[in-house]
Amino acid sequence: MYEEGLLDTTGLLNAVAKDWITITDVIEIVGEDNALSVVMSAKLSEISNACNAVIVNGVDIKFGEENVHFNLSIEDQSNINNLFCVVELGGTEFPYQADGGVCRIYTAAEIAAIYIAAQTLITTQTTYHNELKQYVQTLTSAEEVSAIQYGMTLPEPYLTEMNEKLAVAQQQMQAIVGRMQQAAATNQA
């Protein structure tokens, strides 16, 4: 099926994931010279798709007693960014709709919380994905590459690099919150 073009390399790796065939079978099918590049290409695509799926799935936020879910498709991200711009420009509230909810008025503080939760998830996942991708690209066998799973603990130095980058992002989010609180206090005075 692979030779006839009916099955691509991703399909071969899916068959491995379902235990229908082994990596040894993939190597035999694509040839030893092509095995690493084929498996790596498919794995990089797989982890990219997994990263995107986690992001699009979105975030849950608790406002008082209410648990609210926000998907983070590209359109949703754009809407949330626009909401945050309203707050940055001095808006104190704005209507928006959580997934499965009705449109309601969110306060500036709630909009900031939505934005920060969304950006934190996006930054965490994309940073993790990029570090995992770098790690995968250092591997030298199809078997090693095939064993990689999105969500696994990163080995060093990738874990430290990710944590350092996320610490910078967290500091910036805290700076945003601080500036917003300062602006709100100034406006109330």
Where are these regions (language model features)?
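A preference for well-ordered globular domain cores
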Residues: 1-189
